[in-house]
């Protein structure tokens, strides 16, 4: 318990596997005795607890298996599924830790032995194992095969702890009774036994031999593999030398953790308890003696993309002849096959010498080699055919058939653009200025001149002619201009058809000016579009501006809105505040009504007729004018009733013709700080209009006159 790293402790009414973190001692009432506590951490959880050393047990594989069997026998559904999953995961981690710990202990023992032997620098003697002890006590007749019905499990031993040279050493000889010496290449790949054999009707056994890659250091080192079969071993010195000279390599797959602990070969030094003994997981490779040249030897199996290897295509002949399969368990879930690993089936042994047997070619191996190669080629062709079929199924249609809307606008493109109150109309892009994000477009209409200048519009207001909203835009245009938009679409369609047929190559404007478009252009009725759509493309032909370089256009000036009216309204607002809020003109108005001050506007009102058609108000904003008039009505009710009775005039006319001018003139004089006479002249002159305001007013008069004439 003092050295245990993993224990079983009780936590939350269950036995949980845990890892020991620390050990502490606590004194009790009896000073001679101390209580030991363990600080442990539950596996697969971050929970850390403190338990007594007397309440824990050392973690063993048998305990985990017992707990797992009890969980499997439960028929009730667990109350807390998440807790149950965490408990099962902890048990699984504990089982993996125990399995990995056994493998690490074997590898560490083999590594220490290997380091000791490398320091000595001398050939190591044969290391005894349970398999060797059994082989030394058996008679020779049992080794070479007997006709007894009793079968023993083949015991395969792989050495990972000895390395020596035997190419030129005369003492490097193997006694058939003692077994083979073991050697290991520290830098070579891990080589493990591929499997065992079974006894046939004649009593002979099939031997499976393993070869390792020869490591040449200084030109005099070779590697040897040991074989323990029924407790006996055969000599393989000559074949090992051939292997070292040719540099061949046959490696076996790694072994899963499925070997019983009581198996004597499982406890042998250097044995990996990962793969069941006697199992063969890859197609056999031919004898090295059967290859006359290195190029004739079959290549290693090519690994798949997912790291696995192809399964063997044919069954082994000894198995088909009635040989019993290996009694070892099947490959477990931890089985892994390296891409460089293959297995080899050796020839059946005889009473003759082993060296003479290996020098002869094996027909079964050659036949099996050809079958494996043919099966591999057929599988390769089938996989290639399946890949091609999948590519054909995933083939996409040509990109020409798929329309992708372009992201930018270029010269000559057909677009949609909305002109004022009219719907979106087809147009042609004449020029693009990416820096200003502007484009010049020319509308497609009945009397379009390709040499005319277009309208400069923003790129954001344009839409490609084949956009997603094309049908919607067409329907909106057909509501008021069905015949006109139909002619535009037919012209564009004819242009695209001629481009596709190859009868015309050029831009849309070139097509419109060419004779090839005349049949479509002549179908338009006289002035059909001109009467409904304005002359959008009016202007002079594009010519270089005088004083500018050839071909360079005069920069387009941005037309700002007219702000003259807004400026006058802000100035008049000061006059309104002076009259209404400050009541600065009230004393002046009272003096006029009481005849204390002479008034030009009062004299004109008294001497003029009652019918006046036009009144100059000076104030342009109706809201400002309403405020001033309401204020003047209050002043008139207080003072001007007697004057109105004397004159028998209209109250509204009196306010507009007398009080309003006097109040505005008084406000101008006070705000602008001028005398009364100058303020009166400014009032009579009225607001100063800008040139653009006069032009707009004149155009409105002309439109009104034309409308009346129609």
Curated annotation (Swiss-Prot):
Q: Please report any disulfide bonds recorded for this protein chain, giving both cysteine positions.
A: none
GO molecular-function annotation terms? Answer: nucleosome binding
Ranges of biased composition (kind: Low complexity): 128-137, 288-297
Point out residues bearing the modification Phosphoserine. 161, 374-375
**What is one Pfam family matched by this protein?**
PWP3A-B_C
- GO biological process terms, semicolon-separated: chromatin organization; DNA repair
| Region: Disordered, residue numbers | 106-160, 177-204, 230-398
Family matches, as CDD domains: PWWP_MUM1-like
Q: What family is reported?
A: Belongs to the PWWP3A family.
What domain notes does the record hold?
The PWWP domain mediates the interaction with nucleosomes.
The free-text function statement in the UniProt record for this protein reads: Involved in the DNA damage response pathway by contributing to the maintenance of chromatin architecture. Recruited to the vicinity of DNA breaks by TP53BP1 and plays an accessory role to facilitate damage-induced chromatin changes and promoting chromatin relaxation. Required for efficient DNA repair and cell survival following DNA damage.
**Additional info?**
Acts as an antigenic peptide recognized by cytolytic T-lymphocytes in a melanoma.
**Protein name per its UniProtKB record:** PWWP domain-containing DNA repair factor 3A
Gene this chain is encoded by: PWWP3A
């Amino acid at each position: 318990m003092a050295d245990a790293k993993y224990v079983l402790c009780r936590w939350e009414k269950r036995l949980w596997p845990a890892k020991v973190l620390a050990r502490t001692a606590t004194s009790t009432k009896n000073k001679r005795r101390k209580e030991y506590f363990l600080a442990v951490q539950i596996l697969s959880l971050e929970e850390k607890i403190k338990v007594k050393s007397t309440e824990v047990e050392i973690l063993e594989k048998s305990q985990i298996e017992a707990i797992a069997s009890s969980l499997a026998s439960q028929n009730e559904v667990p109350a807390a599924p998440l807790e149950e999953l965490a408990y099962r995961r902890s048990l699984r981690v504990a089982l993996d830790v125990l399995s990995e710990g056994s493998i690490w202990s074997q590898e560490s023992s083999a590594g220490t032995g290997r380091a000791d032997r490398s320091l000595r620098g001398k050939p190591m003697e044969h290391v005894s194992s349970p398999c060797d002890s059994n082989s030394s006590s058996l008679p020779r007749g049992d080794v070479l095969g007997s006709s007894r019905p009793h079968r023993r499990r083949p015991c395969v031993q792989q050495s990972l702890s000895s390395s020596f040279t035997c190419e030129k050493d005369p003492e490097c000889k193997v006694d058939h009774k003692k077994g083979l010496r073991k050697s290991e290449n520290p830098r070579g790949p891990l080589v493990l036994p591929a499997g065992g054999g079974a006894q046939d009707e004649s009593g002979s056994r099939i031997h499976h031999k393993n070869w390792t890659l020869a490591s040449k250091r200084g030109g005099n080192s070779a590697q040897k593999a040991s074989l323990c079969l029924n407790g006996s071993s055969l000599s393989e010195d000559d074949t090992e030398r051939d292997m070292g000279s040719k540099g061949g390599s046959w490696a076996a797959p790694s072994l899963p953790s499925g070997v019983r602990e009581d198996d004597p070969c499982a406890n042998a030094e250097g044995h990996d308890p990962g793969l069941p003994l006697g199992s063969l997981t890859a197609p056999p490779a031919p004898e090295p003696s059967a290859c006359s040249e290195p190029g004739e030897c079959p290549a290693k199996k090519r690994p798949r993309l997912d790291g696995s290897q192809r399964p063997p295509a044919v069954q082994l002949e000894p198995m088909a002849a009635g040989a019993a399969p290996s009694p070892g368990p099947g490959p477990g879930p931890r089985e892994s096959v390296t891409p460089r690993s293959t297995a080899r089936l050796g020839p059946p042994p005889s009473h003759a010498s082993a060296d003479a047997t290996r020098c002869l070619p094996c027909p079964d191996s050659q036949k099996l080699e050809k079958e494996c190669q043919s099966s591999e080629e057929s599988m390769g062709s089938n996989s290639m055919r399946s890949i091609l079929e999948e590519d054909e199924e995933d083939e996409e249609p040509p990109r020409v058939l798929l329309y992708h809307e372009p992201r930018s606008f270029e010269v000559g493109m057909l677009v949609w653009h909305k002109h004022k109150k009219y719907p979106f109309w087809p147009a042609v892009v004449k020029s693009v200025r990416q820096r200003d994000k502007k484009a010049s477009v020319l509308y497609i209409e009945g009397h379009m001149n390709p040499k005319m200048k277009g309208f400069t519009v923003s790129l954001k207001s344009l839409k490609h002619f084949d956009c997603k909203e094309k049908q919607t835009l067409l329907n909106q245009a057909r509501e008021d201009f069905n015949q006109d938009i139909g002619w535009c679409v037919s012209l564009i369609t004819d242009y695209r058809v001629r481009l596709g047929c190859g009868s015309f190559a050029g831009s849309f404007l070139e097509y419109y000016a060419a004779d090839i478009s005349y049949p479509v252009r002549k179908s338009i009725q006289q002035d059909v579009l001109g009467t409904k759509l304005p002359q959008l493309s009016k202007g002079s032909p594009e010519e270089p501006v005088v004083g500018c370089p050839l071909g360079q256009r005069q920069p387009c000036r941005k037309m700002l809105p007219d702000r003259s009216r807004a400026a006058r309204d802000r100035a008049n607002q000061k006059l309104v505040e002076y009259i209404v809020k400050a009541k600065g003109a009230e004393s002046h108005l009272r003096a006029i009504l009481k005849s204390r001050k002479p008034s030009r506007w009062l004299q004109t009102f008294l001497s003029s007729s009652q019918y006046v058609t036009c009144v100059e108000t000076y104030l342009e904003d109706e809201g400002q004018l309403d405020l001033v008039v309401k204020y003047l009505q209050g002043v008139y009710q207080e003072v001007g009733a007697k004057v109105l009775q004397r004159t028998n005039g209209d109250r509204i006319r009196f306010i507009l013709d007398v009080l309003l001018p006097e109040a505005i003139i008084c406000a101008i004089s006070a705000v602008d700080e001028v005398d009364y006479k100058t303020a009166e002249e400014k009032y009579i002159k009225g607001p100063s209009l800008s040139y653009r305001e006069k032009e707009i007013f004149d155009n409105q008069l002309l439109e009104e006159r034309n409308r009346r004439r129609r």
